[in-house]
Regions:
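Structured interaction patches on ligand/partner-binding surfaces of diverse proteins
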Residues: 106-116, 330-334, 697-709
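Outer-membrane beta-barrel pore domains and translocons
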Residues: 166-172, 199-203, 239-241, 280, ...
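Short Pro-Gly-centered beta-turn/loop motif in secreted/extracellular proteins
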Residues: 82-90, 309-315, 677-691, 697-699, ...
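Post-signal-peptide, soluble extracytosolic/periplasmic N-terminal scaffold domains
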Residues: 2-4, 11-12, 17-21, 28-269, ...
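Feature captures outer-membrane beta-barrel proteins of Gram-negative bacteria and organelles
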Residues: 153-154, 179-191, 212-228, 368-384, ...
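A short, solvent-exposed beta-strand micro-motif common in secreted/extracellular proteins
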Residues: 91-97, 319-322, 600-603, 686-698
Length: 709
């Protein structure tokens, strides 16, 4: 945005008024396209034709008429007809132009009254012809209405650097101190983004031992470049391999290339329902999905297709209400099933990686394996009802590969998934299978899944860590009602090669009473060991001024814990928040020792970051703590302190003019500093972000080139 002061002349307004009046004085013309018009007769002569004086013996073909035609409520313009034997005739070519289905071998003029179920309203005085025809004798184009959008805002990039930080410190009553900092350093320009994260910690002893034990570890360092038009991101450095529901991701140091759908967030990747209908007359269309209106609009006569992205998951019902110009309504019913695991037909999602396995992540900074590993993942939408998957990974002495598929059963029969994978490691082979089925609607849900491994099944991660689960099964179901709330039960069984089999059964219930009060309860039962059984009951109440009160009771075989929490979060626009918590534990175990603890905390959220501090006590012991989060950015010739940045941001420049108010999405976000700069955050990456200024709040002598971008 460029702003500059400009001296306005006194004659500006009269000159603008003169231009405006000159524009108003220009007359407008209207052109009408004729259908097969080959005559010089003007409209006045057409209106003066006297059909009563017409003698059919004088003209074998009949009298030529050019009538203003309306077909099924839509204007078709001036069209050539014959008037003979007190009837209207038209050539096959004319009828085809209007949209009628006419036999190809018919060359003779066709009597309009011979067309089945055609309603004819001919006004000789006005020279108009109104036709209403059934759709089965018309060949009209399908009208497509869509609420989907494939907008691709042009992303822009600038050069700069960013530092995100999260610092935490604590001290106990005996002077034991600890300090930790998580940092992310990011450098960026048109060539990509270079990012590095690290975790630094320091601890001191108690009493006279004031020595600090310091430790710092690098977490991830990578360079990435994205290509939004191709939906591809290239990443080099520390990467995480792509994984499917039946595979495990692995940390590598190397190169990754693959699909990144977040580069086009307006694009939908899952199959979206289409609704088809017909309208004899111009009509209004309303679409309801599960009782909620999703679309309303108008369609002309003829077949139409409505494409939309309804906001629901699982099974649902849709109603399409078509109301024509005469007020007559027709309702069409559809069964739907929305499946986010499916890809649209002919859409691919892929990723390939090459590198060495990262070991001791979070402990050592540069600990990598010696063997090269490679992996590849591909998902493909074979149709809107079936998506195929495959995954392959190899390293020295190991190969692993498998295939899978996701099916939508019928129109609303639920989702079925199955996979089969095999591996070979040091001459030993193994197999892994998985399958699951799920179905849900707005009230009921059901799920069943199983995974198992046979033989010596291994993947790349097994070479440096634990093996995948050898067996797991899960079954769950739930139901929701307005009067009784949501409730359900589930059963889980997991077996690891190094551990005993674990079996759990659980049940839950929750209900909201209006907008302020909600209750919930959850029971977990360990089938293998009753000592791990637990019952959790909680209540949450929303009070005035954004204050919330919650209380809970958790009971196990050894103790019962009571907790009450009263809090007010800091506003997103900035301000002070606080939290107070009290906890009391009744111990019924061997030591039979009860305890009481509590927390008091204050936090502040401002334009430059967020800080919080608190005191925690447990019995006679207490500790204090504090933390700070934020970011420092250098870009566009300025240095800025702001809240932590995890998405897009921009620097607004007003050519050195200070105190210019700036808005984001029509909400005030701040004013420019003494250099005419303002950092605007957060922005939605690869989406439309409306940044602007309010010209009504600016001095009258400022010339504005642009008020929003």
């Amino acid at each position: 945005m460029a702003l500059r002061r400009h001296q306005m002349s006194r004659w500006t307004h009269p000159f603008a008024s003169a231009i405006f009046l000159q524009c108003v004085a220009v007359s407008a013309s209207h052109a009408v396209e004729l259908n097969d018009v080959a005559t010089d007769i003007d409209a006045t002569e057409l209106a003066q034709l006297n059909l009563d004086s017409y003698n059919p013996d004088d003209d074998e073909d009949g009298l030529d008429l050019y009538l203003d035609v309306t077909l099924n409520g839509a204007s078709a313009g001036l069209t050539h007809f014959y008037y003979r034997d007190d009837q209207l005739w038209a050539s096959p070519k004319i009828l085809q132009q209007l949209g009628f289905v006419v036999p190809a071998n018919n060359a003779e003029a066709i009597l309009l009254n011979s067309l089945p179920d055609l309603k004819i309203d001919y006004d000789a005085q006005q020279q108009t012809l109104n036709l209403i025809a059934p759709l089965d004798i018309l060949n009209l184009n399908t009208t497509v209405r869509s609420t989907r959008t494939n907008k691709r805002p042009q992303a822009t990039s600038s050069s700069g650097m960013l530092l995100n930080y999260n610092i935490y410190g604590s001290q106990t009553q005996d002077s034991m101190k600890s300090l930790s900092a998580y940092t992310e350093l990011r450098a960026f320009n048109k060539l990509g983004v270079l990012s590095s994260t690290a975790l630094t910690s320091a601890n001191s002893g108690t009493g006279n031992n004031s020595d600090w034990d310091r430790h710092s570890v690098r977490l991830d360092t990578s360079w990435s470049q994205s290509f939004p038009d191709k939906l591809i991101t290239v990443r080099a450095g520390d990467i995480l391999t792509s994984a499917l529901s039946w595979t495990r991701p692995t940390r590598l140091g190397g190169l990754q290339i693959g699909t990144n759908f977040s580069l086009q967030p307006y694009r939908s990747t899952t199959p979206l329902p289409s609704f088809f209908g017909t309208a004899t007359l111009p009509s209004a269309v309303e679409l309801y999905v599960n009782g909620l209106k999703q679309y309303n609009g108008d369609v002309p006569a003829g077949p139409f297709e409505l494409n939309t992205a309804p906001s629901f998951s699982g099974a649902g019902t849709a109603q399409l209400i078509v109301t024509d110009a005469l007020g007559q309504s027709t309702t069409l019913n559809f069964s739907l099933y929305d499946a986010h695991r499916l890809l649209q037909s002919d859409l691919s999602d892929w990723s390939v990686e090459l590198g060495t396995v990262r070991k001791s992540y979070g402990i050592h900074s540069f600990d990598y394996g010696s063997d090269i590993a490679a992996s590849g993942t591909w998902r493909y939408g074979v149709s809107d009802r079936f998506t195929a998957e495959t995954h392959v990974e190899v390293t020295n002495g190991l190969s692993n590969g498998g295939i899978a598929g996701t099916w939508l059963l019928g129109k609303s029969g639920g989702i079925l998934f199955a996979s089969l994978a095999g591996s070979e490691s040091q001459g030993q082979k193994g197999m892994q299978y998985s399958a699951n089925y799920s179905w849900n609607d707005s009230r009921f849900n059901f799920g069943l899944s199983a995974l198992g491994a046979y033989g010596n099944y291994r993947d790349v991660g097994t070479q440096y860590g634990s093996a995948p689960a050898s067996r797991s099964e899960q079954i769950s179901t739930g139901y929701s009602t307005e009067s009784m709330g949501r409730f359900g039960i589930s059963y889980n069984q997991v077996s690891q090669s190094e551990r005993d089999k674990a079996q759990f059964a659980s049940a839950y219930w929750s209900k909201s009473f209006g907008r302020k009060l909600s209750l919930s309860a959850n029971y977990n039962h360990d089938i293998s060991s009753a000592e791990n059984n637990s019952l959790y009951v909680s209540a949450s109440l929303s009070l005035d001024r954004s204050i919330s009160l919650s209380s809970s009771v958790q009971h196990t075989d050894n103790d019962t814990l009571f907790a009450t929490d009263l809090s007010k979060p800091a506003s997103n626009t900035g301000g002070i928040g606080w939290r107070a918590q009290a906890r009391h534990r009744l111990n019924t175990g061997k030591n039979n020792k009860d305890s009481t603890s509590g927390v008091a905390e204050l936090n502040y959220r401002g334009h430059y970051g967020q800080i919080q501090a608190g005191i925690a006590g447990d019995g006679g012991d207490y500790s204090s703590y504090a933390s700070a989060t934020g970011a420092v950015v250098t870009m566009g010739g300025g240095l800025f302190a702001t809240r932590q940045i995890n998405s897009g941001f921009a620097v607004v420049s007003t050519s050195g003019i200070a105190n210019i108010p700036v808005s984001l999405q029509n909400s005030a976000i701040g004013t420019t500093n003494s250099k005419g700069l303002l950092l605007v955050t957060p922005l939605n990456a690869y989406q439309e972000n409306k940044i602007g200024i309010d010209p009504m709040q600016l001095p009258a002598d400022l010339r504005i080139d642009k008020v929003n971008i």
